[in-house]
C-alpha cells in the first residue's frame, strides 16, 4: 500500500503579485524552492490564510533571490498580493517507509526571506537572509 504524505511546505509565504493572463501556476523564487525541497512543475496545494481558500496548481521556477510568490492564471483569483499562504507538496510513499518519512518545512518571514527550516520532528536550522 502507498500513502499520500506531505513532502514539503513553505509556511506563511506572502503573495507578491498575480497575473491573470498567464496560463496558470505559481512562480516561486528558486532559492526558496531549493530550501523547501520543491521542484519546477511539481503539483502544489496552496492554502490562503486570509480567506481559507485552498487551490491546486504547479510550480514555475522564479528568479533566485527575488522572493517572488506570484499566482498566475485562475490561481491569481484565489489570493491577492499581501495575502499569506501555505504552499505544500505531497508524495506517494510505501506504507513501511512512510513511518520514518519526515517532510521538509521552510518558514519564511513577511518579505519571503527564509528564516529557518527543519524536517518534521527535528530541530530548526536558522537561515541567513
Curated annotation (Swiss-Prot):
Its cofactor is pyruvate. Keywords: Autocatalytic cleavage, Cytoplasm, Decarboxylase, Lyase, Pantothenate biosynthesis, Pyruvate, Schiff base, Zymogen. Disulfide bonds: none annotated. InterPro entries: Asp_de-COase-like_dom_sf (IPR009010), Asp_decarbox (IPR003190). The active site is at 25 (schiff-base intermediate with substrate), 58 (proton donor). One of its GO terms (molecular function) is aspartate 1-decarboxylase activity. Its EC number is 4.1.1.11. Pathway: Cofactor biosynthesis; (R)-pantothenate biosynthesis; beta-alanine from L-aspartate: step 1/1. Is synthesized initially as an inactive proenzyme, which is activated by self-cleavage at a specific serine bond to produce a beta-subunit with a hydroxyl group at its C-terminus and an alpha-subunit with a pyruvoyl group at its N-terminus. It is found in: Cytoplasm. Binds 1 pyruvoyl group covalently per subunit. It is an enzyme of class 4 (lyase). Catalyzes the pyruvoyl-dependent decarboxylation of aspartate to produce beta-alanine. PANTHER family: ASPARTATE 1-DECARBOXYLASE. Heterooctamer of four alpha and four beta subunits. Belongs to the PanD family. This is Aspartate 1-decarboxylase.
